[in-house]
From Swiss-Prot:
GO terms for biological process: DNA recombination; DNA repair; SOS response. Belongs to the RecA family. Residues 330-351 are annotated as: Disordered. ATP binds at residues 64-71. Its main location: cytoplasm. This is Protein RecA. It is found in: Cytoplasm. Pfam families: RecA, RecA_C. The gene is recA. It comes from Rhizobium leguminosarum bv. viciae. InterPro entries: AAA+_ATPase, DNA_recomb/repair_RecA, DNA_recomb/repair_RecA_CS, P-loop_NTPase, RecA-like_C, RecA-like_N, RecA_ATP-bd, RecA_C_sf. GO terms for molecular function: ATP binding; ATP hydrolysis activity; ATP-dependent DNA damage sensor activity; damaged DNA binding; single-stranded DNA binding.
Length: 351
């Protein structure tokens, strides 16, 4: 048996044992796994994920620095699920959910289940009960860092019990994984970044709650604020970069940039302009943007305004972009790539 046949036999054996998509070629454009997904509210991120959105029946981790857009991205995913008639829940361990902002992002508050638990154990027990019901489509836990173990709450200020939160997360995820898969519920954990002390080489960044979530998550998204969107001197939004650090559904390491506008969420028209230029669908000549010889405007903001005022043209460009998703995904892969800044260091459990 030659090498290629031996390799094919090994690959088919792996797929029979562990399921289709358990091994793939990194450069493959095919959506190797037929899986139900929910849009993130960002066309570029849906394309970068390779399967058209975040997968159902899986654990997702969204992490990044403060005010980078983690909760916004989770709420936009909830809004997209609700548009399809899905039932969503929000476990607000931080006790910081702003209902006015959530409504502006398109979340139907009347049909959103919300819990503000007192302890980490209570939060994860509520999560487990909702997942086991099999009736919840998207469940968000905000955030892992706020899942404080009962022993820590009942103890004295200054008491330290090493690895308590990491053990809590590890036990909960072992219990949750099978239920999540059976119920087809998407569980999104929002996480924060901490700095490891005394790191000489590599990134000092790590995420809270130990290493268990890194292993159990099918998709990990690293979201960062990279700049401000200004109108004259006033800041009206954030320029945001999201990197797909881990992806079990399609090739990872793709990277996408978009604007998050205050009180609006992800700027869909801004994405159409940026992705259109990247795919060659929207032409850029100097400062002018045009589509099929029709001028959209001088400057990016004017082009965004034109598309906002002409929804039919915006839909036409979006359709063209979806048809060119494979080409755009290749560009994302060229821009992305594993680097030491993905927050996925070999950290020990959070103390």
């Amino acid at each position: 048996m030659d090498k290629s046949k031996a390799l094919e036999a090994a690959l088919s054996q792996i797929e029979r044992s562990f399921g289709k998509g358990s091994i793939m070629k990194l450069g493959s454009n095919e959506n190797v796994v037929e899986i139900e997904t929910i849009s993130t509210g960002s066309l570029g991120l849906d394309i970068a994920l390779g399967v058209g959105g975040l997968p159902r029946g899986r654990i997702i981790e969204i992490y990044g620095p403060e005010s980078s857009g983690k909760t916004t991205l989770a709420l936009q995913t909830i809004a997209e699920a609700q548009k399809k008639g899905g039932i969503c829940a929000f476990v607000d361990a931080e006790h910081a959910l702003d209902p006015v902002y959530a409504r502006k992002l398109g979340v139907d508050l009347q049909n959103l289940l919300i819990s503000q638990p007192d302890t980490g154990e209570q939060a994860l027990e509520i999560t487990d009960t909702l997942v086991r019901s099999g009736r919840v489509d998207v469940l968000v836990v905000d955030s892992v860092a706020a899942l404080t173990p009962r022993a820590e709450i009942e103890g004295e200020m200054g008491d330290t019990v090493p690895g308590l939160q990491a053990r809590l997360m590890s036990q909960a995820l072992r219990k949750l994984t099978a239920s999540i898969s059976k119920s087809n519920t998407m569980v999104i954990f929002i996480n924060q970044i901490r700095m490891k002390i005394g790191v000489m080489f590599g990134s000092p960044e790590t995420t809270t709650g130990g290493n268990a979530l890194k292993f159990y998550a099918s998709v990990r998204l690293d979201i960062r604020r990279i700049g401000a969107v200004k109108e004259r001197e006033e800041v009206i939004g954030n320029q945001t970069r999201v990197k797909v650090v881990k992806n079990k559904m399609a090739p990872p390491f793709k990277q996408v940039e978009f604007d998050i506008m205050y009180g609006e969420g992800v700027s869909k028209t801004g994405e159409l302009v940026d992705l259109g230029v990247k795919a060659g669908i929207v032409e850029k000549s100097g400062a002018w943007f045009s589509y099929n010889s029709q001028r959209l405007g001088q400057g990016r903001e004017n082009a965004k305004t034109f598309l906002r005022d002409n929804p039919d043209l915006a839909r036409e460009i979006e359709l063209s972009l979806r048809q060119n998703a494979g080409l755009i995904a290749d560009r994302f892969l060229q821009n992305g790539g594993p680097d030491p800044d993905d927050g996925d260091g070999d950290a020990t459990a959070e103390m």
